[in-house]
Amino acid sequence: MANERWILAPGQRVTFARFMELALYHPQLGYYARPRGAYPAGPEGDFVTAPTAHPLFAALWAEILAALRERRGQPLTFVDLGAGDGRFLRNLAGFLDAQTVARLMAVEVSPAGREAMAASLPQVELAASLAELSPSEGPCVIFASELYDALPCHLLEGTEGGLCELYVEASEDGTLRLVADNPSTSELSAYL
């Protein structure tokens, strides 16, 4: 990451979860705060994922949703968690009929992503968090293809001495390294 030195002052240490949160979601410098298209897809740029690679993926999901609607006997609500700029939802909306999905909803933490969706998908209810969405009645499909790889997480390591957590620490010259130490919270040990 080009701006990694801003995240930690020399000698500062944070959990990997906190570092990941800052690197992805910092309002000015985080990965998801950058303007859309700043890193075009390809070897020198951003990665390509199934929802954005080809409209065929959305066509497949439209067929799945139509079958679910038929089976349930009522229109569905479709929620895309981590919707990005809405490319998948734009493709999906083009394949859906009005009888299949009653509501299209998107959760996206990036203001730039929500802005892009607001401009091109007026029929989609947008929110920065799941808690901001109004409740849905009837069957609901939660789609989270782009979400799980962007959830901050703790890095843990089992050693002969017990459970350790890996922290990100900045050296005096600003380079980052992983340092093992006691878990940041007892909840981590209790969970495992």
Regions found by a protein language model. Name each.
Residues 6, 134-192:
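Class I S-adenosyl-L-methionine
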